[in-house]
């Protein structure tokens, strides 16, 4: 037993040194989740917007064949029928082309992969034409049989780790990742995506799988494909969906030796702060002091595709596109702060939490419509195209690894800080104006506020801020303004 445990620990250590590198192209940071977009549309977005605006990566919806469900809800993508690359987003040829085109403009691809389970009862027909019999645990498209699954049981007690990992999540047939054949099939699937040029994976429902089994799977994966610009010996970036708000049997610390985790406490906490339930002044120690995993183990976000719908963690405290002023402020803070690896959500609008993406006919996904101001229509929200968000991606790229300096707060809901001498940001979440002379840390000069506008040649389409020889500037953010944040950086100097 001791030897077995030692082998598992060594496997964890071997994986640990490789899976935390995002594999971003130099000078870029931040990824965006283009939720339910088609592959052809993502390829064009990489070339036309993500690449030119400094985004480092794109998380895409599950790429493999899923069950076709009545009314085509978004969650059908999380009910696998096979590992064939055939979904409403496109086929394998389109996906491969997308990855190649995105890599060519410096935007890496991260695939949402689902291998905790297969489709639940009722999922008998797939998007690639495969059939299945979930009631008998038969999925010929892989193929999987009943021998490859855990015994049928429901998860009802999250204080029982065995039940959480060995029973079925909402009726989804629970694969046994300790089974060598299942491991072979999962590794084959992930390696195929690596061959096509992806940079990493978001592992769905990782909390419901045993860490030792995941260590074996991750440890068997190929190195990234150098034909797509990755350095020799690079490993896939692994981010695991582990919802840990405390008080349950399973902890995120069981997974942080394997890769990064989705830090849901970040989403919950940032929502509370910018909704006014906590004061901005307390953000001075934002990070592990708030119960988050280590920075290089934390994928951070304001909201994700689950909790913006009330699923997962956070509940009513989660900020979404439906509360735009505070959402933009929270997103700007996330991108201005050095903690974690930030992911921007890009949604489609919804009124029903089961509602799928916009379609042309009830089945085929519609392409987003782009407006002259960069925003989207046609049912797509495209938060990643909001100026207050994409300009903060450029801010993050500009400040690099510079530390937070010159922290200021008013003892309430007005704060500011610099990132070294390269960027400065201020926030006002009070119900009265912010009008203060603040230390920006920046060289003297006139700067364009990249929240209210953008630098255009030698002019600015928004507010300007004049920094004196002492680094101080008069900062003004009215409580009734559309944006409760102001940001300047050295690349926005006029």
From Swiss-Prot:
Domain of life: Eukaryota
One MF annotation (Gene Ontology) recorded for this entry: alpha-amylase activity
InterPro entries to which the protein is assigned, alphabetical: A-amylase/branching_C, A-amylase_C, Alpha_amylase, Glyco_hydro_13_cat_dom, Glyco_hydro_b, Glycoside_hydrolase_SF
Residues recorded as bearing Pyrrolidone carboxylic acid in the entry: 19
Effect of substituting residue 11 to S: In strain: KN-28
Reactions catalysed, as given in the entry: Endohydrolysis of (1->4)-alpha-D-glucosidic linkages in polysaccharides containing three or more (1->4)-alpha-linked D-glucose units
Keywords assigned: Calcium, Carbohydrate metabolism, Chloride, Disulfide bond, Glycosidase, Hydrolase, Metal-binding, Pyrrolidone carboxylic acid, Signal
N-terminal signal peptide: 1-18
Outcome, altering residue 71 to R: In strain: KN-3, KN-9, KN-10 and L16
Entry GO terms, CC: extracellular region; extracellular space
Cofactor note: Binds 1 Ca(2+) ion per subunit. Binds 1 Cl(-) ion per subunit.
Assigned EC number: 3.2.1.1
Positions with a binding annotation for chloride: 202, 304, 343
Active site annotation, chain numbering: 204, 241
Disulfide bonds: 46-102, 153-167, 376-382, 448-460
Annotated phenotype, changing residue 465 to I: In strain: 1420#1
Effect of residue 231 to S: In strain: JP-70, KN-17 and KN-21
Listed GO biological process terms: carbohydrate catabolic process; carbohydrate metabolic process
Effect seen on changing residue 16 to V: In strain: KN-22 and KN-23
Listed cofactors: Ca(2+); chloride
Protein name: Alpha-amylase A
């Amino acid at each position: 037993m001791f030897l077995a445990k030692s082998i598992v620990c060594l496997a964890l250590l071997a994986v640990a040194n490789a899976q935390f590198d995002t594999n971003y192209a130099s000078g870029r940071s931040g990824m965006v989740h283009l939720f339910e977009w088609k592959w052809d549309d993502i390829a064009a977005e990489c070339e036309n917007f993500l690449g030119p605006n400094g985004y480092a990566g794109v998380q895409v919806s599950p790429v493999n064949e899923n069950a076709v469900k009545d009314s085509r809800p978004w969650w059908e993508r999380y009910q696998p029928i096979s590992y064939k690359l055939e979904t409403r987003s496109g086929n394998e040829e389109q996906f491969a082309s997308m990855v190649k085109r995105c890599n060519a403009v410096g935007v890496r691809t991260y695939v949402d992969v689902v291998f905790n389970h297969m489709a639940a009862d009722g999922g008998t027909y797939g998007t690639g034409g495969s059939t299945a019999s979930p009631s008998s645990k038969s999925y010929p498209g892989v193929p999987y049989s009943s021998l490859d699954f855990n015994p049928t049981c429901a998860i009802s007690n999250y204080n029982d780790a065995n039940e959480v990992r060995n029973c079925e999540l909402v009726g989804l047939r629970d694969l046994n990742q300790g089974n060598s054949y299942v491991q072979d099939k999962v590794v084959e699937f992930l390696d195929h995506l690596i061959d096509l040029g992806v940079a990493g994976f978001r592992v769905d429902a990782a909390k419901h799988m045993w860490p030792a089994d995941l260590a074996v799977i991750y440890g068997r994966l190929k190195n990234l494909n150098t034909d797509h610009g990755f350095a020799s010996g690079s490993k896939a970036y692994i981010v695991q969906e582990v919802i840990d708000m405390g008080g349950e049997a399973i902890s995120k610390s069981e997974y942080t030796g394997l890769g990064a985790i989705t830090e849901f406490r970040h989403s919950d906490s940032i929502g509370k702060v910018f909704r006014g339930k906590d004061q901005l002044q307390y953000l001075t120690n934002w990070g592990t002091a708030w119960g988050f995993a280590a920075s290089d183990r934390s994928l951070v976000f304001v909201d994700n595709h689950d909790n913006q719908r009330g699923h997962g963690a956070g509940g009513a405290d989660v900020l979404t596109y439906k509360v735009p002023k505070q959402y933009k402020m929270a997103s700007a803070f996330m991108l201005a702060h050095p903690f974690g690896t930030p992911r921007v959500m890009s949604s489609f609008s919804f009124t029903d939490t089961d509602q799928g993406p916009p379609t042309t006919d009830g089945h085929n996904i519609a392409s987003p419509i782009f407006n002259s101001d960069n925003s989207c229509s046609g049912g797509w929200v495209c938060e990643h195209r909001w100026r207050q968000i994409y300009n903060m991606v450029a801010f993050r790229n500009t400040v690099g690894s510079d530390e937070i300096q010159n922290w200021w707060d008013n003892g309430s809901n007005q704060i500011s800080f610099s990132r070294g001498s390269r960027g400065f940001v201020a926030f006002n979440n009070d119900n009265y104006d912010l009008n203060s002379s603040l230390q920006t840390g920046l060289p003297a000069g006139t700067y364009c506020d990249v929240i209210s506008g953008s630098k255009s040649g030698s002019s600015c389409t928004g507010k300007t801020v004049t920094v004196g020889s002492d680094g101080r500037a008069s900062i003004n953010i009215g409580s009734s303004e559309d944006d409760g944040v102001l940001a300047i950086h050295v690349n926005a100097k006029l």
